[in-house]
């Protein structure tokens, strides 16, 4: 019997860098959501752990011991076996938590296959800062180094367009370029948004503190943001340390789709582009 788990894209709608610990880890305050765009993990019983990778974004990925999917399997039960397959649809190292989402989906699927309890957030954190929030992919406020997760007020329905200009961004270099690392967090109590225009108006007053150094490293990110805004996005921003950007649209089933197809895929065929809804 095969068990399947979806690994949705993780989007940082806000990302405030609020400090840096003595061990070098940066402190964040981020509003995180997920989209119905993502990778798929399938697991089935086997005597040993194996990993097969396919899909349109599988190029450059290898089933090596340091692959997050295999690390997740070893973390959960190093003595157990399973045949794992990963269908990769999200670009690698693109700021939307693809590897972390894959690891989290692997933990969920293998826990079900092996009849084990899901790992704690503390255990998941050993795989990466984004893995705990991806373990149970619902809208959340992520603070600290990714170890402090909390609920947020209900979000209005919205569709989303994700765009990656196919450039690499060095996350360590982006953090290193930050001149000020002790910035203001979001307000302790988040508002209750009545509708999408009110929510996007609030987002416009928030920040992604990594956007400026990421754009300095890869100026094409600014072109992506401008393309999304010109296409009518109610709000456009960069997720994580880039280079993937997002545009938010009404949940009418056609605005995001038409933007993704007509404006971005035709005007910029070299960019990766996907559309869907925020979960």
Swiss-Prot record:
Its EC number is 2.7.1.148. The keyword ATP-binding applies. Pathway: Isoprenoid biosynthesis; isopentenyl diphosphate biosynthesis via DXP pathway; isopentenyl diphosphate from 1-deoxy-D-xylulose 5-phosphate: step 3/6. Catalyzes the phosphorylation of the position 2 hydroxy group of 4-diphosphocytidyl-2C-methyl-D-erythritol. Gene3D superfamilies: 3.30.230.10, GHMP kinase, C-terminal domain. It is an enzyme of class 2 (transferase). The active site is at 10, 130. ATP binds at residues 91-101. Keywords: ATP-binding, Isoprene biosynthesis, Kinase, Nucleotide-binding, Transferase. SUPFAM superfamilies: GHMP Kinase, C-terminal domain, Ribosomal protein S5 domain 2-like. It catalyses: 4-CDP-2-C-methyl-D-erythritol + ATP = 4-CDP-2-C-methyl-D-erythritol 2-phosphate + ADP + H(+). GO terms for molecular function: 4-(cytidine 5'-diphospho)-2-C-methyl-D-erythritol kinase activity; ATP binding. This is 4-diphosphocytidyl-2-C-methyl-D-erythritol kinase. Belongs to the GHMP kinase family. IspE subfamily. HAMAP family: IspE. It comes from Ruegeria pomeroyi (strain ATCC 700808 / DSM 15171 / DSS-3) (Silicibacter pomeroyi). It comes from the Bacteria. It holds the Pfam family GHMP_kinases_C. InterPro entries: GHMP_kinase_C_dom, GHMP_kinase_C_sf, GHMP_kinase_N_dom, IspE, Ribosomal_Su5_D2-typ_SF, Ribsml_uS5_D2-typ_fold_subgr. One of its GO terms (biological process) is terpenoid biosynthetic process.
């Amino acid at each position: 019997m095969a068990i399947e788990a979806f690994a949705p894209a993780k989007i940082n709608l806000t990302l405030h860098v609020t400090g840096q610990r003595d061990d070098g880890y940066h402190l964040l305050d981020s509003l995180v959501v997920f989209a119905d765009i993502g990778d798929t993990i399938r697991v089935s019983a086997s005597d040993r752990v194996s990993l097969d990778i396919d899909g349109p974004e599988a190029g450059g990925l290898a089933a090596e011991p340091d692959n997050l999917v295999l690390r997740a399997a070893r973390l959960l039960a190093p003595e157990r076996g399973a045949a794992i397959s990963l269908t990769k649809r999200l670009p690698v190292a693109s700021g939307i938590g693809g590897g972390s989402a894959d690891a989290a989906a692997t933990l969920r699927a293998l826990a079900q296959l092996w009849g084990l309890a899901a790992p704690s957030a503390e255990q998941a954190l050993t795989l990466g800062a984004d893995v705990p929030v991806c373990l149970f992919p619902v809208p959340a406020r992520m603070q600290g180094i990714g170890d402090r997760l909390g609920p947020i007020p209900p979000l209005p329905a919205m569709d989303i367009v994700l765009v990656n200009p196919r450039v690499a961004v060095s996350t360590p270099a982006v953090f290193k370029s930050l001149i000020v690392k002790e910035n203001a967090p979001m307000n302790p109590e988040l508002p209750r948004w009545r509708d999408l225009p009110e929510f996007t108006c609030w987002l416009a007053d928030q920040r992604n503190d990594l956007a400026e150094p990421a754009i300095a490293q890869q100026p094409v990110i600014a072109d992506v943001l401008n393309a999304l805004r010109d296409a009518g996005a109610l709000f456009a921003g960069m997720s994580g340390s880039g280079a993937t950007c997002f545009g938010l649209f009404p949940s009418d089933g056609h605005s995001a789709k038409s933007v993704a197809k007509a404006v971005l895929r035709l005007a910029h065929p070299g960019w990766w582009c996907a559309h869907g809804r925020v979960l």
